Amino acid sequence: YPVLWLQTGGGFDYTDWARYTAIELYAAEAGIAVVCSGTFCSAYMDTVHGDFKYFSTLSIETPRVVRHLFPLSEDPRDNFLAGFSMGGFGSLKWWVRDPEKFASIGLFSGVKNICEMGPSLGNAPNKAAITDTEVKRVAEDDYMFSSAVGDPSLLIGTENDISGMIVKQMAAGKKFPKAYMATGVEDTHYLDNKYFIEKYQSLGIEVYKTIDHGAHNWEYCDKHVKKYLDWLV
């Protein structure tokens, strides 16, 4: 079976896609298996504090186990990544490390690069346009993910730096599959999302961009996970 590796947002677990969207219906219509992952507030990282190997579990152990249990294809043409919010970062991290393993990636209000988003907005894109809502949101994110991430500025140049990894992998001759990226103008991550969509395009990534109305919520994800699966056909 073709398979969609689907990551949820911060503070959630693997059941949320099934509970808050119609992903089971959409997957049945598309004839695709879906493997949902959720790692609470870990940013899908092997954490800085504590020995919690969330990214290793997601990207190494989970595929090995589920392919042992179920007849899921290993053909890159049959493998797809997607994520909401923090799950967007986890999906991107997997995608930039192993671009040859996937046909595409879908991000729905997906966090694009943690080390360029804080902690004090000093690294944030479009600083002149930052609103009080953005300031509050970044402060909340810093607190929520601090035990996993540590100081986000220390991630620059590591495997957790998505922009840096794209440049590094391209220099090594890696080819990246196409990307579907959607963000709503009412989203609290809108400035970040718009900036990174344009940045990844400038780095040579083929991006199908959607900027429409919608907030950082499951209603938006439900709409765009369906659009993403339709886009794959």
Predicted regions and their residues:
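Non-catalytic cap/lid and distal C-terminal segments of serine-dependent acyl enzymes
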Residues: 1-233
